[in-house]
Amino acid sequence: MADKQIERTLIILKPDAVVRGLMGEIISRFEKRGLKIVGMKMIWIDRKLAEKHYAEHKGKPFFEPLIDYITKAPSVVMVVEGRYAISVVRKMAGATDPKDAEPGSIRGDYGLDVGDAIYNVIHASDSPESAEREINLYFKPEELFEYCKAADWFYHTHARSKKEYLDSMDCLER
């Protein structure tokens, strides 16, 4: 992951995505976009973890409903890696409020705005600092994996020099 353009970000498929059977469809979107899943698991987020994750919202009127929502049923947490992964995933997720999310975005297609409740199916880290903090909340280093994808070949063929190309091929030689 030496390339500065290659980033890792945390994604949470929230309880509404899980109970509505949307996990496969949403995960597929990230894979089709060329992002690499380097860690993934299903967990039931407890209150303590939820409060750590959403600490910056403590004291805001939506904090308690948010904690209740994220702890209501299991979630799928995953780390994806790719070129500009943080901004790519945020764009794919769409606006936080589903009524403001563009059609074609994950929240635009699957999010629900029900009265004063928002079910927006997905969380995506909003910055490199948030991504690092959030990944460390949910994953141990040994739960994140390095491996080659077919798309890696494409990126390696665009090396600027033969040396750069050969140095980058270690992933493909395993």
Curated annotation (Swiss-Prot):
Positions of ATP binding: K14, F62, R90, T96, R107
Gene Ontology, cellular component aspect: cytoplasm
Active-site residues annotated for this sequence: H123
CDD domains found in the cross-reference section: NDPk_I
Keywords tagged on the record: ATP-binding, Cytoplasm, Kinase, Magnesium, Metal-binding, Nucleotide metabolism, Nucleotide-binding, Phosphoprotein, Transferase
Enzyme Commission code(s) on record: 2.7.4.6
Compartment(s): Cytoplasm
Domain of life, per lineage: Archaea
PANTHER family: NUCLEOSIDE DIPHOSPHATE KINASE
NCBIfam families named among the record's database cross-references: PRK00668.1
Name of this chain's protein: Nucleoside diphosphate kinase
Origin species: Thermococcus kodakarensis (strain ATCC BAA-918 / JCM 12380 / KOD1) (Pyrococcus kodakaraensis (strain KOD1))
Gene: ndk
